């Protein structure tokens, strides 16, 4: 089989350590949420998010709902959008710097230089994805990607979401390789016709290797498995 022409990558547990998301990003958003909402309550984007939250739970304080969703690690679009706005402020004022595995950064650069089309699909908002790759400890990686997708296109465990991504990118399903650490996401992508590879990174507390999908410990191994350029 020919090497993939496009890569669709997850972030958490794939390009970026799970610990960075759960021990740095989430606590930062939670600690700063009340102050951010108070400071930016008149901002149009913030007001729209709050209206969406309040429409789901009328009469309940939006902050209470948002913090509850955070405690549940809910993949809900208005929460993810607000987190993205809070993180934007943190990245821009120097309080945050994203962590990206060196092997991921090196491979993504090599694949981009070789002409592969690179895309991101994460439960975090598109803005949060762009910020993470812009303010990474491996330099600005954001311009390597031709597109970013979040839960507005659908849930990551639903095959139709990957079909929508294929339609949006104009790629053929079998020409796109999806990289993730989560078996259910890989199952959905495979059901939509994409090629798949599970990242099983040592010490990252991701899922165990699956039987249905090829797996690799890092992006260098992915490159060898699928005949892709490697650093």
Curated annotation (Swiss-Prot):
UniProt cross-references to SUPFAM superfamilies, sorted A to Z: HAD-like
Cofactor: Mg(2+)
Listed EC numbers: 3.1.3.77
Pathway named in the protein's UniProt entry: Amino-acid biosynthesis; L-methionine biosynthesis via salvage pathway; L-methionine from S-methyl-5-thio-alpha-D-ribose 1-phosphate: step 3/6; Amino-acid biosynthesis; L-methionine biosynthesis via salvage pathway; L-methionine from S-methyl-5-thio-alpha-D-ribose 1-phosphate: step 4/6
Textual note on the cofactor: Binds 1 Mg(2+) ion per subunit.
Catalytic activity: 5-methylsulfanyl-2,3-dioxopentyl phosphate + H2O = 1,2-dihydroxy-5-(methylsulfanyl)pent-1-en-3-one + phosphate
GO molecular function, one term: 2-hydroxy-3-keto-5-methylthiopentenyl-1-phosphate phosphatase activity
Any one GO biological process: L-methionine salvage from methylthioadenosine
Enzyme class: hydrolase
Keyword Chaperone belongs to the record: no
Swiss-Prot/TrEMBL keywords: Amino-acid biosynthesis, Hydrolase, Magnesium, Metal-binding, Methionine biosynthesis
Subunit-level organization: Monomer.
Protein family according to the UniProt entry: Belongs to the HAD-like hydrolase superfamily. MasA/MtnC family.
Physiological role: Bifunctional enzyme that catalyzes the enolization of 2,3-diketo-5-methylthiopentyl-1-phosphate (DK-MTP-1-P) into the intermediate 2-hydroxy-3-keto-5-methylthiopentenyl-1-phosphate (HK-MTPenyl-1-P), which is then dephosphorylated to form the acireductone 1,2-dihydroxy-3-keto-5-methylthiopentene (DHK-MTPene).
Protein name: Enolase-phosphatase E1
Lineage: Bacteria, Pseudomonadati, Pseudomonadota, Alphaproteobacteria, Acetobacterales
């Amino acid at each position: 089989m020919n090497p993939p022409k496009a890569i669709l990558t997850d972030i958490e547990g794939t390009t970026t350590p799970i610990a960075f998301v759960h021990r740095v990003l989430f606590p930062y958003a939670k600690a700063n949420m009340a102050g951010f909402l108070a400071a930016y309550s008149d901002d149009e984007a913030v007001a729209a998010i709050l209206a969406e939250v309040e429409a789901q739970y009328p009469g309940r304080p939006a902050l209470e709902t948002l913090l509850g969703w955070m405690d549940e690690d809910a993949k809900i679009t208005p929460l993810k959008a607000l987190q993205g706005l809070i993180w934007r402020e943190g990245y821009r004022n120097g309080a945050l710097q994203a962590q990206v595995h060196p092997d991921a950064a090196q491979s993504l650069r090599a694949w981009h230089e070789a002409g592969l089309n690179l895309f991101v699909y994460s439960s975090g908002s598109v803005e949060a994805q762009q910020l993470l790759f812009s303010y990474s400890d491996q330099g600005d990686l954001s311009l390597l990607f031709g597109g970013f997708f979040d839960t507005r296109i659908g849930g990551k465990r639903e095959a139709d979401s990957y079909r929508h991504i294929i339609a949006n990118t104009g790629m053929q399903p079998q020409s796109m390789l999806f990289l993730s650490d989560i078996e259910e996401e890989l199952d959905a992508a495979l059901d939509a016709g994409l090629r798949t590879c599970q990242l099983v990174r040592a010490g990252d507390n991701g899922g165990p290797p699956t039987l249905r999908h090829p797996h690799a410990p890092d992006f260098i191994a992915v490159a060898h498995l699928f005949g892709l350029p490697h650093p």
